[in-house]
Amino acid sequence: MAANVPPSAETLLSGAAAHPPKTAEEIANQYDLLPKLIPYLDRHLVFPLLEFSSGSQEDDKEMIRAKYELLKHTNMTDYVANLWKEINDSDTIPDEFVKKREEVLAKLQHYQEQSAKITELLQDEDVVGNLRSDKVANLKFLEEEHGVTADMVNSLFDYGRFQYSCGSYGNAAELLYQFRVLSTDNDKVASATWGKLASEILTTSWDGAMEEVQKVKDSIETRLFNNPLGQLQNRSWLIHWSLFPFFNYDPARDVLTDLFFSPAYINTIQTSCPWILRYLAAAVITNRNRAHKNSNVYQKQLKDLIRVVRQEGYEYSDPITDFVKALYVDFDFEEAQKKLGEAEDVLRSDFFLVSAADAFVEAARHLISESYCKIHQRIDIKDLSTRLGLNQDEGEKWIVNLIRDTRVDAKIDYKEGTVIMNHPPQSVYQQVIEKTKGAFFRTQVLSAAVAK
């Protein structure tokens, strides 16, 4: 019988003391996605992530070494040499760096001379005015009228790649664009498109980046039509590269959210990179705050998100996805409030999401309060404030604003410290529809689980 005796308060307290709450830094480290993201990014795209991480790392030397290892095989010779000096506490650099710098400058001169004629022609308005959408006809025109050869066209590709390796991303974007206008080599054109996308990202030219995202997407669908594995790999890369404009350029938000939820891409996320659910969840939650957002579209995105988070919970979870699960799958408001606190720590330590942290917390509080108000007739302001992570005064202001902004039928009893919700009675017909919807949704989830 002794085994069935519940633990004493002292035992519970000592157990809690043995497992104190994690600090913000511990939570951030536990859910750091950098090791998962790096394999899907070009080394130049990894660099901004390392720069961001170095701001929160105590071991500067280790981070400098990581940057050195990342960039030592590029042609950013001066920057790499400076990193070497920092690592080795030296004012001088080995001869190999001097030699490599001379080689890089010589190659730049070579590529510049090799491509000088064709780049000059492509800057001539009269020549460009005679170009058409037919690449074969363009090459024939340039060959007959100006002596342009296939090698000259290919030199644009080589020069663009070299400029990219040197960190001259603006020059690289222009050269790769010029190459793509003329080349009929599909593999090189595809490579140039990826290179131009990276260059647009690294120069924060978000309009240009989104144009390249669409071009890469189209290339994946057409060039790799008969190669499902190749499509999966390329879609995985595109998803990761798209994170840069996703949270830095507002017009990209809707386009990329729709892309990620499309059958081919949500399947890629579930199969290859489930950690992207963090970014999809953050995008959907913060979409709630956007005044121009269509309510029906938002509700559909939220339903799709809940479905995927429910399905993939065994494969991937973090405080952001756990918040969605707690609120919309388990209807556990205490757990949702706890996960929201952890989610804020994760967001502020994530390169892509740090700027969205405040918007996420604001939107999440709205979602908690909306869900809570839907299932309660009388709400204690103090209790709801606690669930939102606010003190009573802040909570009261929050609820007043919520009632005003959402125009819900409710009134505040300041004397009792409660909110009284006026839920209109639902017709029997409507109740049957809602229950049927719920049963159908559960059937879909079970079917998907069985199919896996």
Swiss-Prot record:
CDD domains according to UniProt? eIF3E
| Location of the protein in the cell | Cytoplasm
Superkingdom of this protein's organism: Eukaryota
Q: Coiled-coil region(s) at which residues?
A: none
List the SUPFAM superfamilies hit by this protein, alphabetically.
Winged helix' DNA-binding domain
The leader peptide range reads none
**What name has this protein been given in UniProt?**
Eukaryotic translation initiation factor 3 subunit E
Species source reads Aspergillus niger (strain ATCC MYA-4892 / CBS 513.88 / FGSC A1513)
Q: What is the lineage of its organism?
A: Eukaryota, Fungi, Dikarya, Ascomycota, Pezizomycotina
